Amino acid sequence: MSKPIHIIGGGLAGTEAAWQLARRGLACTLHEMRPVRPTPAHQTDRLAELVCSNSLKSESESTAPWLLKEELRRLDSLLLQCAQKARVPGGHALTVDRDIFAREVTAAITAEPLITLLRDEVSSLSADAIWIVASGPLTSGPLAEEIARLTGSGRLYFYDSISPIVDAESVDTSIAWWASRYGKSTDGTDDYLNCPLDRGQYEHFVDELLKADSVSAHIPEDNTCYFEACLPIEEIARRGRDTLRFGPMKPMGLDDPRTGRRPWAVVQLRQENLRAESFNLVGFQNHMKFPEQKRVLRLIPGLQNAEFLRYGQIHRNTYINAPALLTAALNLRARPEIFFAGQISGVEGYVESIATGLMAGIHAAALATGDTPRPLPRQTALGSLCHYVSGADPKDYQPANITFDLLPQLEEAERQRLRRDKKARHALVCQRALEALEEYRHAIV
């Protein structure tokens, strides 16, 4: 008889791991501490609640985010299926209605007889079970202490922040206009509301942003560590006055229909749900105090009367030093029955969390049935992500998104042949990845 299997955390990684185990005929227990113990960032007790953006990144073929999602689809990811059901317009990105998405995942998990959902907090990991730790960036203190004890290391962290959401009816559409950058959209529609700023408006906005009161991170400012792909706008502005308009406020590919010209800067709003009743400010994660957010963000033309349904917030993300601890199968070298998945393993991004959850579920199933977990080939995005998690330099381990830099390079002859065609190089990498994935699928069936 195999050991019982427990999964800690009902987020993206934990729910995907549970589903993969159930698909292989294995019973498991999924522990989610909400609502018994709430977190600073979650609003509901639903599984797989998205607390930051509602975008699962690019669906443009032969990009790294597309490749990772395509591999997940081919391995029957539950969460990618739910994302498709909850999809809303989002340009070339897979964007979801976060409420529908969480409801779909919760319904699927609770309806699966092989998954037992317990609403409780886990603070210790017994030796007589297989564990998948997918407790996320907001891991509770007692569990974090247990993980530190098991791994013999202290915690690592960085600070992350979430974007504000505004009521759609409060946006002035006589100023804001619908468009996708360069007209790019998966279905040919204009998926973003765009708020233009001229140079004077932009300079005034930056001045007020830099003066705004922020919520204390509770540690000295010079010790604060942010994930570079999700910087608060205040931090971006501190790096230079024009940094914002070359980042989240870049105007490229967006001409104001009122003037026929490109604005000095643009703030993009992306719809939050299918009914387009609310919008999030794309890339506008911040940790200004709430009254300051209202004051400063209402300086943006089109948002002068904005009603905020959610303000930006900052929260601390926790992750282990995975390269010093984990194998490419995402389990501890010293305790092979304990797996890690999601952001606590040191990946950053929704799809990356789903990916590590899926792989941890597959590998835990192999271990539970007496087989040796078999990591994916390095040629795949999934394999490369797990290779990074287990094989990066442990001295300076930083969370990673999926990029082509993580995948193996093409041979020198192929690089030379396609040196002037990056799209063709990426397409070839994707082709080889999917071929390797198909071989892996046939081998593990």
Curated annotation (Swiss-Prot):
Q: Which Pfam families does the record match to this protein?
A: GIDA (PF01134)
Top-rank taxon: Bacteria
- Reactions mediated catalytically: uridine(54) in tRNA + (6R)-5,10-methylene-5,6,7,8-tetrahydrofolate + NADH + H(+) = 5-methyluridine(54) in tRNA + (6S)-5,6,7,8-tetrahydrofolate + NAD(+); uridine(54) in tRNA + (6R)-5,10-methylene-5,6,7,8-tetrahydrofolate + NADPH + H(+) = 5-methyluridine(54) in tRNA + (6S)-5,6,7,8-tetrahydrofolate + NADP(+)
Keywords from the named record = Cytoplasm, FAD, Flavoprotein, Methyltransferase, NAD, NADP, Transferase, tRNA processing
Where is the protein found, in the record's own terms?
Cytoplasm
Q: Which cofactor does it need?
A: FAD
Show the disulfide pairing. Answer: none
Q: Which InterPro entries match?
A: FAD/NAD-bd_sf, MnmG-rel, MnmG_N, TrmFO
Q: Does the keyword Lipoprotein apply?
A: no
Gene3D superfamilies xrefs: FAD/NAD(P)-binding domain (3.50.50.60)
Q: Name one GO cellular component term.
A: cytosol
Q: What GO molecular function annotations does the UniProt record carry, in alphabetical order?
A: flavin adenine dinucleotide binding; tRNA (uracil(54)-C5)-methyltransferase activity, 5,10-methylenetetrahydrofolate-dependent
What processes in GO biological process is this protein linked to? tRNA methylation; tRNA wobble uridine modification
Query: Where does this protein hold FAD?
Result: G9, G10, G11, L12, A13, G14
Q: What is its EC number?
A: 2.1.1.74
In terms of one coarse class, where is the protein primarily found? cytoplasm
Q: Which family does it belong to?
A: Belongs to the MnmG family. TrmFO subfamily.
What role is this protein assigned? Catalyzes the folate-dependent formation of 5-methyl-uridine at position 54 (M-5-U54) in all tRNAs.
By what name is this protein known? Methylenetetrahydrofolate--tRNA-(uracil-5-)-methyltransferase TrmFO
Q: What organism does this protein naturally occur in? A: Solibacter usitatus (strain Ellin6076)
What's the gene?
Answer: trmFO
